[in-house]
């Protein structure tokens, strides 16, 4: 008996057979589910299908709104049916979503495509992390969670770098290839989700716990909104993060192809450019420690946001090669800014506040602003005013960050910041219940597991 137990469950620090299976299947699911072959060419593809700029960016605005609306109910669905079933449902929806443009390359087909993607992503965004966390905890291997999450992201980025340059040549062979391959990848993620083992010892009873968790969610949501209203420091950190997220999302997704086409960079090269941008962002994300500690995190986020704005404005002045270089510089600055802003946001959350709910609110606010920005982007591009859009975006960022800095220096947020950090200094870190610092993993079983936070 003892020998059997020893072979089934190795000593501390070693992975069990089930833990290895969970990690490997999670790698496969995350890589295949997020491998969207059409990403470098979707704008040009929709233009060739006869959609106007207003229609294309209108669909993007609807996508952001839909993602916000799906965010809350899909969390409750995950509680009711369980994370493993939620991953399976999301993979089925994503497979169907990627086939919609193949079945109907029209406004309706692309609208259904993006609405289904919003639903599929909402179903899986928190469930994948929650399943991995609970699976490793059930096997007493939870110390491997952070490495497993990081490796999954790295593999996903590597797959995009390898696959995206192939999109142009593949489209020359079969025009719908990017969408068919995306559907095949999503189907592969479904196979991984079906193969995921049932978690033992997690205490999950989704059906019976749903009511209790739904009530807890409503209480946390109310508490989170009151926390934002009563904490000027937290609200300012959120607003500053909006500049980073909106600029990066709009440029790297919505404006990426119009900018390249405007400067004469052919559609066949878009995949290679996006792959280079992905590498630049990955390097920045992996090396935030390169930023000097002489400046506070707030100052660094502001500086990087201004760098993003300046890069956008500079794109109106350069030629094709300069624009490609500026896009890579933009991606690198985004990579540096994201982890700094994420830690800044975590540090700004009071110790007794519902952290996961507040972070979800931040995500919803970011996407709501993107929805409004996408409408404006569509109007500018449709009118042929791309350069004006880039300059106005840069100026709006400067004005927003200037207002944030004035409020910070005026002392409006000082009292709230002091109450959160305990000393008001940048080195202080708020503690979770139980004394765990906010930038360290929460102990297993606490309310701050990564169940609903997006990467």
Language model region names:
Residues 180-211, 406-418:
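Helix-loop junctions on the cytosolic side of multi-pass membrane transporters
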